[in-house]
């Protein structure tokens, strides 16, 4: 899985969890939205600006404005 190398770089559980869920979302919203809510505040503190774009994708999936 491609997210393993990313998570290895940051050694962050929030990074691993978020990227795993975001990967599933590409195949369809097959996961509860609360999983994104629980990880979203964490990744904003651990990931660089380049990865914050993933947060925007999660917002769209959740129907946030």
Swiss-Prot record:
Top-rank taxon, per record: Eukaryota
Any one GO CC term of the record: cytosol
Pfam families: PMG
InterPro entries: KRTAP_PMG
Keywords: Keratin, Repeat
Summary of subunit composition and partner proteins: Interacts with hair keratins.
Function: In the hair cortex, hair keratin intermediate filaments are embedded in an interfilamentous matrix, consisting of hair keratin-associated proteins (KRTAP), which are essential for the formation of a rigid and resistant hair shaft through their extensive disulfide bond cross-linking with abundant cysteine residues of hair keratins. The matrix proteins include the high-sulfur and high-glycine-tyrosine keratins.
Name under which the protein is recorded: Keratin-associated protein 23-1
Species annotation: Homo sapiens
Lineage of origin: Eukaryota, Metazoa, Chordata, Craniata, Vertebrata
Name of the gene this protein is made from: KRTAP23-1
